[in-house]
UniProtKB/Swiss-Prot annotation:
Signal sequence segment: none
Source domain of life: Bacteria
Binding site for ATP: 30-37
A single GO molecular function term of this UniProt record: GTP binding
InterPro entries reported in the protein's UniProt record: P-loop_NTPase (IPR027417), RapZ-like (IPR005337), RapZ-like_N (IPR053930), RapZ_C (IPR053931)
Protein name: Nucleotide-binding protein Acel_1111
Ligand binding (GTP): 81-84
Gene3D superfamilies attached to this UniProt entry: P-loop containing nucleotide triphosphate hydrolases
Species annotation: Acidothermus cellulolyticus (strain ATCC 43068 / DSM 8971 / 11B)
Keywords: ATP-binding, GTP-binding, Nucleotide-binding
One Pfam family here: PapZ_C
Protein family: Belongs to the RapZ-like family.
Amino acid sequence: MTGDVRRLPDGHAAPALNPLTGIKLVVLTGLSGAGRSTAAKCLEDLGWFVVDNLPPGLLDTMVDLGVRSGGAINKIAAVVDVRSRAFTSDLYGALGVLRNRGTALRIVFLEASDDELIRRFENVRRPHPLQGDGRLADGIARERELLRDVRGVADLVIDTTNLNVHELRGKIIAAFSDDNQPALRATVVSFGYKYGLPADADLVVDCRFLPNPHWVDELRPLTGRDDAVREYVLAQPGAQDFLDTYSKVLGTVVDGYLREGKRYLTLAVGCTGGKHRSVVIAEELAERLRRLATAESRIDVQVAHRDLGRE
């Protein structure tokens, strides 16, 4: 088996919004251990409202929740797995109701070879949910049989046998990414070391190698948002060299993030109090990040000044 994606003839890259409900629904199912959790997390990163282990009979309820949200929830991904012998009939019944309502829905089925599933379960030292007192292979075989008909009606089948996590994410992104959604969301946050590092930082830049405007009387009451402080900081020896050099580092990091399917980057830029130097450098690096965007890989860059105003 290979990492192939099979589509039914009428399959599409993503379901269209239905004019009646305004809701897109993806039913994510397949064999245990085939990567449902990874696929669900990827959909969540793409902006889908993800519900795990949802009984088929509650699919209609979830769509109603989306309708009542007034547009706050318009993309729902429901992870559905085998829990009973009635699974298939319950799922078919629920899908029939949704289709009669005109809901735009799509079924995604994940699978892998028996040998690969056995290897994955043995690696995590967990039993198969349908194994009972029998062998692991028996549980896999039983689940495969229970889901055979569901696989047959799936709009998208992904064989994850030879896929790593990043490759699976890539396939999900290719199938469900909104064309208007950026490839990477980057947040550049300035901070003061005296208040501690931002807990969610992926990269940290220390600006304390630059002279501190705090010791310049006329600049002390100002912030890095003021032109006088900005000009002072950027005129210091090493400031431009640092920005040019670190911009190249960011280019390498962004390329790697995109290759690995990572969609979020937080860059923390620090100085002593988070008032002058870090604010200037954060704004400059944010602009450099924006320049890294291409037509194929749009980057959404936000700037936050965490400790500005604390002094």
